[in-house]
Amino acid sequence: MPIKPLVILPDPILREISKPVEHIDSTIQQLADDMLETMYNAGGIGLAAIQVGIPLRMLVVDVSIFTSIFEPDAPQDPIIVINPEILWLSDERNICMEGCLSIPGYSAEVERPKRLCIRYRNREGEQKEIEADNILATCLQHEIDHLNGCLFIDHLSKVKRNMVIRKFEKRAKENNLEKEIL
């Protein structure tokens, strides 16, 4: 399974809205496997297809490193999520420290709904629903945001968000990458 290169801020593809997966076939299944391998290699707990440059409504998560200790009733296997639809979000809120493989080296506290329910297709194309809370709910919301062109820094104050964007634009310029205003 090849490890895919990660798309890093300020790459404008991160702001694209991903398109639905039309057919779940061996190509999509291989992409899911590659995304998991890429996520594990980078030390992440979630990855959206857009973060490897593929604008499809698809993501992978594996929060077992946390849940095995703190939430043993939560899913302990990786979850492949295709064409997710949020069915509901709780009114109760939770603040979690979030980071992102596309914004390396930066993390911040983000407030989100504590629980949610999503409907999605799995790797085999079967329709599933999952109710999640705590770290899994946060991770799913974070990755679904990516599918809609939203980054976790968009949940921060304008001052903090602009500071992060400027830092990564400067880094991109120093690395002779194309500068793009988000």
Curated annotation (Swiss-Prot):
Catalytic reaction annotation: N-terminal N-formyl-L-methionyl-[peptide] + H2O = N-terminal L-methionyl-[peptide] + formate
Question: What is the protein name for this chain?
Answer: Peptide deformylase
- InterPro entries on file: Peptide_deformylase, Peptide_deformylase_sf
Q: Which family does it belong to?
A: Belongs to the polypeptide deformylase family.
Question: Which keywords label this protein?
Answer: Hydrolase, Iron, Metal-binding, Protein biosynthesis
**Which residues carry out catalysis?**
E143
Annotated source species:
Bartonella bacilliformis (strain ATCC 35685 / KC583 / Herrer 020/F12,63)
PANTHER family named in the record: PEPTIDE DEFORMYLASE
CDD domains given in the database record: Pep_deformylase
Q: What does this protein do, in the record's words?
A: Removes the formyl group from the N-terminal Met of newly synthesized proteins. Requires at least a dipeptide for an efficient rate of reaction. N-terminal L-methionine is a prerequisite for activity but the enzyme has broad specificity at other positions.
Give cofactor(s), names only: Fe(2+)
List, alphabetically, the SUPFAM superfamilies matched.
Peptide deformylase
Q: How is the cofactor bound?
A: Binds 1 Fe(2+) ion.
Q: What is its EC number?
A: 3.5.1.88
Residues that coordinate or bind Fe cation? C100, H142, H146
Q: Does the keyword Endoplasmic reticulum apply?
A: no
Taxon lineage: Bacteria, Pseudomonadati, Pseudomonadota, Alphaproteobacteria, Hyphomicrobiales
Whether Protein biosynthesis counts among this entry's keywords is yes
